[in-house]
Amino acid sequence: MSVLTDLIYGGSHAVAGLTEGAVNDAIAKFGAEKAIAFPDTAYFFPTIYAATGVKVAKLGDLPACVGVLKSLITDQEDLGQALNAGLATAVGAEIIEGLKYLDGADPYAAETGIGFVPDPVIRSLGVPLVTGDIPGVAVVLGKADNAADVVSVVKDYQSKGILTFLIGGVIDQCAEGGVKMGLELRVVPLGHDVTAVIHAVTVAIRAALIFGNVQPGDLPGLLKYTKERVPAFVNTFGAIDNVVVSAGAGAIALGFPVVVDIDLGENQVPGALESVLDHSLTVKRSLELRNIKIKTKELPIPVAFAAAFEGEIIRKADMHTEYWSGKNATAELVLMRDPSEIEDHKITILGDDMDGGEKNYALCTFIEVAGAKMQADFESVIERKIHAWFNYMEGVMHTGQRNQVRVRVSNDAFAKGLRLKHFGEVLYHMIMDEFDAVVDKCQVTLITDEAAAEKFRDEVAMPRYNERDDRLLSMTDESVDRFYTCILCQSFAPAHCCVVTPERLGLCGAVSWLDAKATNELNPQGPCQPIFKEGCLDERTGRYESVNKMIQEATHGAVENVTLYSILEDPMTSCGCFECICGIEPVSNGFIVVNREYKGMTPVGMTFGE
């Protein structure tokens, strides 16, 4: 037996023994009928459920699962068989972690890690994953010989928007090294025990069930989906024992390559298990192994800029400056201009900068753009991006839109030199990068003088908002000559396609008809393609020949017919990025609507997840 397979089998046998003993002890203490479950999930023990279809609901269900686990450990001198033993380790880790939640326990209450990741969190990751705001998932475990190495790697992942899970001593090393952590910052500590790695694994597995329509019990389908659709990888730091190696084999079986920082010599498996001893190359090689390409944005600002900072919360005690509509005039407005009316890259500040000595200021953000292909309909599309772009700056928190805005700047960001001119630079560079197909010139004006801000809000911004609202209210499905497809989610749900109309947003809620129109203008070969309204077959249900034809093409034949307005006749497809489910309750001949946050049973006998 090779050194590598010997380590894998040694680890899987150790975990199998621990698992069997833990299950027997739990049954002896609580009885076989004792209920067991992970919190806030509809997928039971997700690894077991996805791989076998077994719904673990009580302790008495676990001995059979242990039997399946042990059957995967064959001790054969074959790498494929050894990888199956790695999957057995994953099953064992899931059972061991699940037992921690027995009797309503909260095993991570006193831990730095969060433990099990609830279903709503995974569903909330759907949109950023498919849009590329989260380009990949890193699982970092162990304890680095030099804490600075893992801190540097994790900060690099964070700056690139990679969702990073931490397991083991690296959690404390990153905390001490100043890494900002939390679900909202995309660096998530899971737990110190090596078995906590299963909480990262089940995120990938539930993604297959939620977004990919993989059926429970379809192990080949699950492995195919995670390998092809979930851009995850593993980094280990420090010495590794046979349990870590076996857990790594389970990751490789799911299609996730493993990069270690010790020399494995001839035990390396190119493309799957590799040694990278120079930590400055760890990130680069990890991304290469999953073919993750990241478009870096070098902006002339003194703080980091990444999607990972979008969820950063700035408390009042940590705040240097606030721009808030509750105290001062605020507005955000984009207007189309003739090219002769504006000066490209001109950034003007009317009033005091944030170093003027006050805590609270007015802030009206006025962006003027010009371009041969620019349309007034695109103004609001660009405007809504201000929220994301401001939040991408480390140390900046933005909420709201239009004339109801709150922006906070942290003491730390101010100390690093962040000023309003940098806000203008961010807006200019991001508009010219993301909207270069329609914008040729852009100038930015930031107004902090209270009188000037009030005048701008009342005389310029509000009338324009009202004009847009009046137009949107008059826009119906009948008033346009085309709809749009949206297949952004096909990276996770390959048979899904939305039909976006003026009266029907994309299922995720993030793509309006105007968004789809702008997306098509910006990228004519992209995810949003026009569907000209031709061949109306049924006005009542919204059935069109042209829509059916486009749906067939977009779903590669998986879906042949769609209606726009019927819940019973060929309703539109869905993936997992929705907030609510609407269904029919036959007894009362009525409809029910359930949101994903609701954890209870619905009148139709199913939970949201079911």
Q: What does each model-found stretch correspond to?
A:
Residues 1-387, 403-407:
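Acidic, serine/proline-rich low-complexity intrinsically disordered regions
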Residues 9, 13, 20, 24-32, ...:
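Cysteine-centered metal-binding/redox modules
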